[in-house]
Amino acid sequence: RLGGGGCGVEMALMDLAGKAYGVPAYMLAGGKYRDQIRVYSDTPSKKDPVEMGNALKERMERGFTYLKMDIGIWISEQVEGGLVFPNDYSDDKLNEGSTGGSLKSMMVEAQNVMHPFTGIQLTDKGISEISEYVKIVRDIVGYEIPIATDHFGHIGLESCIRLGKELDKYSLAWYEDMIPWQYTNQWKQLKNSVDTPVC
């Protein structure tokens, strides 16, 4: 997302340099290391875990051997008391909303605030709801294939650690973007607190 433009320019420049030198661009990056690479299949968010499990299963049937799904605090909204909001996100604001009146609109507002500063926290009920979602998906897909995860939401480090510890039992491939990349000390804490790789 943030690096896409720069990466596109770099790839174009390497292609131009390769043409100028009469060599493939990969030679400028150190040479050829493999003939093929494994790709994963990302999957759009689904509120229903059975739908998500079936969507992942369909990707397996198409030959993908590595999967990725979005899980996050939007799952916790399905249970009352799943999230703790700051005072300025009272029920009235969530019902009327400064940008449309729903948890989704509040999340849009939160997109402009870095994760550690939103004040949004997962409760035990919220963590259980997300865990149950992943359990249902794993029951459908099985454990024979890696599943990576992304889009956890704008929550702080403590909620990320609590959620990560709960989800470790599902043998997920990795937790992606739980916190912003520039908070390196928090990444270290997260990495040292969970058994699943983080990126």
Cite the ranges covered by each PLM segment:
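N-terminal capping/lid subdomain adjacent to the active-site entrance of alpha/beta enzymes
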Residues: R1-P146, H154-I161, K165-K169, S193-D195
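Conserved residues at beta->alpha junctions
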Residues: T43, H151, M178
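Short acidic loop-to-helix transition motifs that present clustered carboxylates
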Residues: H154-G156, P180-T184
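Active-site core of metal-dependent hydrolases
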Residues: G164-W181, V198-C199
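Catalytic alpha/beta core domains of metabolic enzymes, predominantly
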Residues: Q182-C199
